[in-house]
A protein has these predicted regions:
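Active-site-proximal cofactor/substrate-binding loop regions of enzyme domains
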Residues: 2, 22-111
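Bacterial N-terminal signal peptides that target proteins for export
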Residues: 1-9
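Short loop/turn motifs at secondary-structure junctions
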Residues: 8-12, 111
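Short, conserved sequence motifs used for protein processing/export or organelle targeting and
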Residues: 86-253
């Protein structure tokens, strides 16, 4: 494992040479020993039922501290943008992911706020808790390295890593999230309310793994992101989308 991490670190460093100004050097992580608890909140600033769910997620993040097995992801959807307030963090791709999850998990439908835990709809959060216990030991291991990159006009994240034991049925996805976001809503159902968000997904997608188990990606990010409040999650899943392992990187700036 140590040699694999060294190889990944060297690969990322090589990718960064002569490309742009780095906000900081590469940082590395190894996937955790436990199967992760991936909590996906689908929310919108245009929905007046969503602030309690946003607060619940922030509270849960605070309570879980630095629990490496807890992966919180807040996806802002765009289907409420037409009722008076355009959510600045919403993306059509997040709406598409919610619809796909609802379909494959047998959920009752698509709505906000909606929470999925490891791909399954979970309404128990309304009682103050959700099913967030770890689901056993991880059967997959991988190492990952990343570094912020800026050329003064654009912001990006360079990601590289390697699965210890590649398998055709495995797939990897990433999510870059940001904490501490604040919006003063001026129209719509939440008009006049100041909303605070954590774990807001700013970029997400699939990671292509080669036959040797290696993967790499250069992710374009919103220029306004505050790197000190941001983190990268990489999640290994089986063919059905069930999480098997995860790693989180909070890189220095």
């Amino acid at each position: 494992m140590h040699s694999t991490l060294c190889q990944v670190f060297a690969a990322v460093s090589a990718m960064l040479v002569n490309t742009a100004t780095l906000a900081a050097g590469p940082c590395t992580a190894v996937s955790g020993a436990a199967v992760p608890v991936v909590v996906e909140l689908y929310t919108s600033e245009g929905c007046d039922s969503c602030p309690p769910a946003d607060r619940w997620l922030s509270k849960t993040i605070s309570e879980r501290g630095k629990d490496a097995a807890f992966i919180p992801l807040a996806y802002h959807v765009d289907y409420w943008d037409h009722i008076g307030w355009k959510d600045p963090f919403a993306q059509p791709a997040f709406t598409q992911r919610q619809s796909a999850l609802a379909s494959t998990s047998g959920a009752s439908g698509v709505y906000t706020p909606q929470i999925f835990v490891n791909g399954k709809e979970d309404r128990s959060w309304t009682g103050g808790a959700a099913r967030l216990a770890a689901a056993g030991r991880a059967s997959v291991k991988f190492s990952v390295a990343s570094a912020w990159k800026s050329d003064g006009a654009a912001l990006a994240l360079i990601v590289s890593g390697k699965l210890v034991e590649p398998a055709p049925s495995l797939r990897l996805r990433y999510a870059v999230t940001e904490n501490g976001l604040v919006s003063a809503v001026k129209a719509g159902e939440n008009r006049g309310v100041t909303l605070r968000h954590d774990a807001v997904v700013r970029a997400t997608g699939a990671l292509t793994v080669d036959t040797n188990g290696a993967f790499s990606l250069n992710v374009a990010l919103p220029r306004a992101m505050k790197l000190g409040n941001s983190q990268l999650h990489v999640i290994a899943e089986d063919a059905r989308g069930a999480p098997l392992a995860a790693a989180t990187l909070v890189c220095p700036v």
